[in-house]
Amino acid sequence: MGVTKTPLYETLNESSAVALAVKLGLFPSKSTLTCQEIGDGNLNYVFHIYDQEHDRALIIKQAVPYAKVVGESWPLTIDRARIESSALIRQGEHVPHLVPRVFYSDTEMAVTVMEDLSHLKIARKGLIEGENYPHLSQHIGEFLGKTLFYSSDYALEPKVKKQLVKQFTNPELCDITERLVFTDPFFDHDTNDFEEELRPFVEKLWNNDSVKIEAAKLKKSFLTSAETLIHGDLHTGSIFASEHETKVIDPEFAFYGPIGFDVGQFIANLFLNALSRDGADREPLYEHVNQVWETFEETFSEAWQKDSLDVYANIDGYLTDTLSHIFEEAIGFAGCELIRRTIGLAHVADLDTIVPFDKRIGRKRLALETGTAFIEKRSEFKTITDVIELFKLLVKE
């Protein structure tokens, strides 16, 4: 299978990215512009264009028609750039302070021109370095509560929502999640990647039919529950942050899926960072886990009471039941994320940079055990505190 490009598609380089910015009139005329390709992800080129005289900058992001991490042997649709720019614009309608502003997009060139966020740091990098970002979980809880509610059936007329489901159909990137999060880590698949010292624990997982059945249920929900427009890849590497500011980026995996998925992915990545820390240094992560759920629950509930179009919205117990369902699935999805980030294709630096090696293996084993417990016991948790306490118990705190 070869790489497919649209007739007008042309891969940008630093000079052509500058030419595009000039053509679009995004800088004052006769500005002297510098450009640097700064992308460190698997799927895109990212150009930082800077006008030193006026101290202005922007980002030009272009999707490439293959996964950079693999090469042209893994072709990917460039339509994901349309998905990303459309998702950012829609998210910006509800939380403009939490996403980058989009200035321009071109579907055929798979280009999105957006606000420069280089004054911020990728949250995963900062957390690994020991930063705690006091407002991170409150901001992400608000992002989740508003974006997930206002794109759902609770807030939209059915015909409008169905048009959005169509607009954000994203089969190729969903396929990546379906395989790398919900399938391959639970079987002896060649995409898996783990240290040989983990093999006994990995094979224990592969031989656990009970957890496989529960993972299958979660996968089915991901496949079939078109509840709302989700980000689809909301980990700490998809967030820029500082002590006071938070911006969610990279929603190219966006589609209509289960509300709990984004919630669970973010929570899992907080726990992954906690595993990279020791003792009291984990406490800020536990506080973030608690805060993100509480803020999401509060924000979602306020939006429900204020703006729900569902005729059943005011029936006593309906909101409570809805939140309980979201919570249960979120913890299950978090378990899948913990496992796949430990033994799947795409690891996280939180675990892979732990030293010495024996300590790293021990923490990865704990990630597998915690992920398995979250999947199997998700219906038993009543509060987010229950989840945190189980995590503490498993990591021997």
From Swiss-Prot:
Top-level taxon: Bacteria
Q: Which organism is it from?
A: Bacillus subtilis (strain 168)
The disulfide bridges present are none
Q: Which annotated residues bind ATP? A: 44, 61, 115-117, 250-252
Question: Which reaction is catalysed here?
Answer: 5-(methylsulfanyl)-D-ribose + ATP = 5-(methylsulfanyl)-alpha-D-ribose 1-phosphate + ADP + H(+)
**What is the protein's name according to its record?**
Methylthioribose kinase
Whom does it interact with, and what assembly results?
Answer: Homodimer.
**Molecular function (GO) terms listed?**
ATP binding; S-methyl-5-thioribose kinase activity
